[in-house]
């Protein structure tokens, strides 16, 4: 099966392969046993997923047909990604620079996150959840979405949002103000009598379910989503979110102490689970 790549890239990669040997070739995912689908499938059946995948940060652990199909093409995708980056560097900065980059990437001097998809999809984004909190699942077409009214529905919407956005990027999904909005909906539920029993129990249970659901392998065949939740000290909370107005007309600046405690509860729940 012919695979067409830049000739200078092919020559440079061949020279590097000869210089560093088979061990480096395997580490990079460019060994014939990894590029050949038949050999890969045979190896996948006989080994652990972590020993077969070329992406050690893939967050995939289970051996099944879905994970096999997800991992099978990564060597080819990485090869084409390197070819594309090499071509663009050569075009902009010359062949010598492109060769230097390729060798430094190959020998571990550089590390390209999620290399198999590096030239196809963006890596990480941080998302402001204000619109999600006020409008609901606005990003889904042909969907009669409504703004979340309670903490449970807001967290459900966040899960859907993370799934949607994570499948359109290769890295982490940052949620810098998710705890700001969980605080608002938790306080709203408690003030309006939606939850009348132990308020501390309510938020801890909600956080626990949220964390467990985010860690389910619902992303890209057999991965859990990479999610970053930000924790801020008093000065950052005041500077970044103090002026945020909640839908009820109150401002985040009025609840800084409560927000600090809210963040602490979240971290306690994470610690208990981990």
Give residue spans per PLM region:
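Catalytic alpha/beta active-site cores
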Residues: 1-274
